[in-house]
Structure formats: C-alpha cells, structure tokens
Amino acid sequence: MKEPVWEPNPSRIEQSNMNNFMVFAREKFDYVGHNYESLYRWSIDNPSGFWEAMWKFSEIIASKPYKFVVDDVTKMPGALWFEGAELNFAENLLSPAGDDQTKEKIALVFYGESGDRKEISYQDLYNQVSQLTQVLKVMDVHEGDRVAAFMPNTIESVVGMLATCSLGAVWSSCSPDFGINGVFDRFNQIKPKVLIATDGYFYNGKKIDTVSRVKEIGDKITSIESILVVNFSGDYENSVLIHQANTIEWENALSRYKPISIEFKQVPFNHPLYILYSSGTTGIPKCIVHSVGGTLIQHLKEHLLHTDLKREDTLFYFTTCGWMMWNWLVSGLAVGSTLVLYDGAPIYPGPDVLWNIAENERITVFGTSAKYLSAIEKEGFKPGERNNLSSLRTILSTGSPLSHESFDYVYRDIKEDVCLSSISGGTDIVSCFALGNPLLPIFRGQLQCRGLGMAVEMFDEDGQSILGAKGELVCTQAFPSSPVGFWNDKDDLKFKDAYFSTYDNVWAHGDYGELTEEGGVIIHGRSDSVLNPGGVRIGTAEIYRQVEKVDVILESIAIGQQWKDDSRVILFVRLREGLRLDELLVDKIKKTIRENTTPRHVPSKIIEVPDIPRTLSGKIVEVAVRKVVHGEPVKNTDSLANPGALEFYRNLVELQC
C-alpha cells in the first residue's frame, strides 16, 4: 500500500454526510457495514435499496410516489427508474426558499471579471424565477418545449434554467464564446422556442460584443419565436436588437410581473430536463438528453455524500454554461448551500483572481480544472501564502487527469489540510464515475473511489474485469443519470452505438483507466487517444505527467503517428515565451519520461509548436491533431477555442522522416 498524502481526521469522518448516510442505511434498510468499501458493495449488490435510501435521505420532493425503484439494472439501455413518481427539478432546487431558516440565506453570488459583485437570496431567487416563469408562459412555453441560452455564467442564467424547468420545459445552453456555426450546429437540432441571450461578455480584460451573433442565431434558427436579451455588457440599448419585434430586454420583461406562487409542473422521473452536447470535434455534436429525476438524485448523491456539501457551505466551480460542470454546480441549490459564480478569464488580471474570491466569500469547496492548477503552479503562484484560505475544506479538480506533481503543489503551496478530490465522469452522464470521499485518504495521482451505485470496472482486451492493470473503463449496471437518449435519434441507434456497441449491456465510457489496490481510480487518458507503439497500449496522461515536471514546458499534446507498419509516439510542446526547443531540452524531456515510465513511452519525435488546440471547455484535442497529422479532415472545428492552431500540425517536415 502507498502512503497517503492526506487523511481525514476522526471528527471530520464522524460529522460527514457519508457517515450519517451509513447510519441511516443501517437503521432504515438492510445495510450492515461500517466503512465505505462495504457501503459501495451494498450499493452495487442492492441497487434498489441503495437508491431508495438515497431518495429518502436527500428528502426529494415528489407529488406522486414511485411504484418501484428499478426494474432491471442489467438492462442497458432501457432500465426503468422510479416508475410512477412525478416531481419537478426546479421545485427541489428552490425548496430552501420555502424554509424560514434558509429563505433569506444567500443563494448565489456572482463575480464578473472586473470585480463587480452581485448576490441574491433564496427568496429573491424564487421571486425572479416566478417572474420569468410568467414571461415564458406568455411566450407560449409548455412542457417539453426547449429554451436555449447563449449566456455567460451569471445569476440570470440560473434563473433562466429554473424558470424553464419549473414549466416542465427543457433547458440547453452554450457559452457566448461559441462561434455562430457551433451554436447553430447545437441549437438548430433541438428547435428551441425561446432564446435567452447576452449582448456581450468580458474575457481577458476585453469586452466582446455578441449582438450580431444573437441576431444571426435568431434569424437562422426558424423555430425561435422569442428572444430575451440580458443587457450584460451594456450594448443592447444601442443595438439592432432593440428594434426586433420578437426581442425584449430581460429586466423590462420581468418588471411586467409581480412574484407569485410558482405552479411547478409535475413530470415523470425520466422526463427530459437538459440537453447537453458532445464536443463535436469528430462531427456534428450529439444532443445528449438527461432526465429530471436521474440528474437530481445523482447530483444529490455526489453533493451530499461524496463532496460532503452542507447548508452552511459555499460552493464554487470555475465553469461556463457550455460545460456540464455548470449543471453540476447549480444542483447545489437543492442542498441549500451558497453557490459562487464567476465569468471571465481565471488568471486575469493575475493568478490570484479566483483565490481572492475564495478568501472574500469564505469558500469551503473550490472546484477547478487540472489544467488550471498546473498553470498557476508554473506561474510560481502560491495561494496559501497570499490568501486566507482557512475556510477551504475541499478542492475539486476535473477536465483531465491530475498529475502527481499537482497533488504535491496543492498540499505544499495551497493548503496542507484540504481534501483534494480529483473527479471524473462526463457530459455523457452529467455526473461522475469516480470522485471524492470524506471518509477516505488521498493518494497521489488517484481519484479516491468509485461513486456509490456506479458499477465501474476496467476491462482488458478480452472483456474481463481486471485490478491493478490498465483497461477500458466500463459500467456494468444501469444507473439513474444514464441519458434518456440522443435528441432525434430514431430507435436509439446512435445512442447504442456510442456506448453499447463494444459490449452487450455494458456502458463503455471511452476512458482508459485502472483500479488500484487502495480502492482508488487512475485515469490514463481517453481510449481513442491511447498510444500503441509496438502493440503496447499507453495512456497519454502517463506521458503528460512526466512532461509537466519540465518547468519550461507550458503545455503538451501526444499522438500516435502511423509509421512503417507500426505506430510511433509524437510529442508536441509549447514552451515559455522566448525559449526554443534544442537538443539539450529534447534529451531532458526524453530522460524524464524514460526514468519514470518505460522506454516505450519515450517519444520518437519531440516538436515545438506555438499553440495547442483545445475545446471551449479547455480540453486538448488529441484526435483532431492526429487527424491533421495524417492528412484526414477534421469535421467540425467550431467546437474549438483556437481552431487556427491545427494548421501548425499540417504537413510537418519533421514527421516525414
């Protein structure tokens, strides 16, 4: 067994929601264990008992009871969950507004890039949702209709989602940094009736006008009957939008109605709630439909139990409305916590911007990406020395595997006594397969545990479950947050092909990972980016972990290039400004990789590039780079934040020999 880098103290364990849930499950159900391993095993062996316990422990509000919890967990896709139950997602998230102890509590705090701050209580949030619900009714929004948002991460975005869901309508959002083609490829598939849009946004100290894009979206997507424009950047009043008959400004629309009691539309457990999108780097984005009940109970499980979120907590996650972590974040309202929203660049005007917010708001749970932690470490920034982080209890990291060095950085330069939970799942399940745990120690490079109720295993090439070795991450039992399906996917053909074409009745997630003897999980990268030199499978994250040790490298991307009837590893690196790749640095990189992995991991070629292509949510795109290197078309570049970067990889002389 390895030595942990952090362990929870007995008091923290005893006071945790996870511990309280174990007591609850022992008293009310047939669970008899006293540790996480036994609880996890019970959740897999008795899924009906576990998910019913979760429903009751989290006090989900429903107008009709369920007839049964699940009909058959071996049926994937197609398992029925909580059949007969009727509920409303927004009603559950706004429930603190009906509690005298929490209705005046701050629900949301918003920070803009310029430092402007706004806050809203649960009662005022309820009132604004009530007003917008009345607006949407006048706009003829009904159960099942789609409302699309082209919005920054603001209070208005949360109000828009809650009002939409209160009516039983379906919410879908993109961040305003999406190009017009990227927005069209997404929203035109789902035919929204209403568009909620911003007149602009701020990033890296610049104000970016979106008025022309909003007008073009409204013109091109003919299903849009009404447009609500949020005057976020101050450009609306002098724009062409003010003269459009189907367009109204947000404040103007809400001011026409007084807050009244919301009639929450009661819908079945499996009723569509969100439409999220795949990255779209291999074609038109897939429209992934997530359910009301599945999203709610899964997020409550992850917030209450795995994150140990409580009413007195303040939760922050750096995200945009175009990333599933936004959907995950806003579900924290159901717990009664205070959520902190931020829109802008995470390191503008300096690397301290998010940590200043953490100090000012006394944030207890701070969520970010692995890439961000690596970036501020390379900047030499030490939040623990600059900021008072005494309230900080948990740091969450996702988006890509968190390197061993980033674990060291957090405990050395941010805070010694903090639960650093690397989490992994995806848009596909709007949640996590592996994540944090208040009961368990932290080991460098590992996610603490598999999520309760998630039958996660690693399969070898023969489809056999393996421990302590690398394999395909799969889920062998149905789970509530499995998508309803893809939008407009006749007979679920694309949905089945995406997740169930590799194994029968087994979800293949597309991650390459490992289950450890400590009970944790290691993610080695995406399966479609796995390198295969000489027939040996290597996850790209194994290489990135070593490259991050070389301080002059800001970012890297590795691919496999077909070469002489085999595959060879190619590593591209972006260096600090003013530096150049020479033989000494190449030798240092290769030596670092060889000494910490195997000779097979050592790249055949290391090439300097000025930029690394990435998605709008910050994920590097190995598949797109591999396609360009091999002269294959990249079908959809509108999902990339910097599509022009792909040109650096085309027809490289270095790869011709």
Where are each of the predicted segments found?
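Conserved AMP-binding/adenylate-forming core of the ANL superfamily
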Residues: 38-42, 90-91, 108-162, 179-184, ...
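Conserved AMP-binding/adenylation subdomain of ANL enzymes
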Residues: 294-314, 324-364, 379
